Swiss-Prot record:
Pathway: Cofactor biosynthesis; methanofuran biosynthesis
Family membership: Belongs to the MfnF family.
KW NADP (keyword) present: no
Species this protein is from: Methanococcus vannielii
Catalytic activity: gamma-L-glutamyltyramine + [5-(aminomethyl)furan-3-yl]methyl diphosphate = (4-{4-[2-(gamma-L-glutamylamino)ethyl]phenoxymethyl}furan-2-yl)methanamine + diphosphate
Function: Catalyzes the condensation between 5-(aminomethyl)-3-furanmethanol diphosphate (F1-PP) and gamma-glutamyltyramine to produce APMF-Glu.
Enzyme class: transferase
Name the record gives this protein: (4-{4-[2-(gamma-L-glutamylamino)ethyl]phenoxymethyl}furan-2-yl)methanamine synthase
Enzyme Commission number: 2.5.1.131
UniProt keywords, alphabetically: Transferase
Source species taxonomy: Archaea, Methanobacteriati, Methanobacteriota, Methanomada group, Methanococci
Length: 222
């Protein structure tokens, strides 16, 4: 947050979507205004336990629309957000760095199979296109959840500039695209400004830059 306030915007929301969680950090007058504990952050829309890889699909919803029918889903650990992220081209196979639920490769074919299992099925019973449609249904739920929480933080602090970073940047762009339609909000991408490697390791990059600036300041004073 300190790096963002010093180098990008002193009044904004930093949204960092990793593999497991999404952090929503309000920055006001150059200082992080977020709550201190995870419990408080969960209670105040500043922490979401949804990420771009590890979140079980059954956590997002216990029913989805399938063939124009509201359909119950299995609560077993069959598929995760990494599967829908990969199938919908929000991440690459290399980005899918966690273990898969079934221990099989992190490729699109196996992701489609894992997604079909959420409906206690397989690609013999439903088609690949239908499995993609399941992924789309879950993706809509995922981005709506992110948008809902970011909007609440925005309304609470009156912040309109949003800095996005992390493995889930492409997901965040989709989630927050509705906000940019009004021209009131401005989305700033760390990946577009500093590159993908920095977006994937923003905390480490930020610390290194802050330490460098501090060292330069000391040298200038000496």
């Amino acid at each position: 947050a300190e790096f963002v306030s010093q180098n990008i915007d002193k009044n904004c929301i930093l949204v960092d979507m990793g593999s497991t969680t999404t952090d929503i950090i309000p920055i006001v007058d150059g200082k992080a205004a977020s709550n201190k504990t995870d419990l408080e952050r969960l209670m105040n829309n500043e922490l979401l336990y949804v990420g771009s890889l590890r979140t079980p699909l059954s956590f997002l919803s216990n029913k989805i629309m399938f063939k124009d029918t509201i359909t119950n889903v299995s609560s077993e650990y069959f598929a995760i957000t990494g599967d829908i992220s990969l199938v919908l081209d929000k991440i690459t196979e290399m980005d899918y760095s966690c273990d898969t639920p079934d221990g099989k490769p992190a490729d699109k074919r196996n992701s489609l199979i894992r997604i079909s299992k959420v409906l206690c099925s397989d690609l013999n019973q439903i088609s690949a296109d239908e499995s993609i449609n399941i992924a789309i249904e879950y993706y809509k739920i995922l981005i709506d959840l992110i948008l809902e929480n970011v909007k609440k933080v925005s309304e609470k602090y009156g912040l309109k500039n949003i800095v996005i970073t992390g493995l889930g940047e492409e997901i965040l762009k989709d989630a927050l695209s509705e906000l940019t339609k009004s021209n009131e909000f401005n989305i700033i991408s760390i990946k577009e400004r500093y590159g993908k490697d920095v977006s994937l390791a923003t905390p480490s990059f930020s610390v290194s830059i802050l330490l460098k600036n501090e060292l330069n300041a000391k040298l200038n004073r000496s």
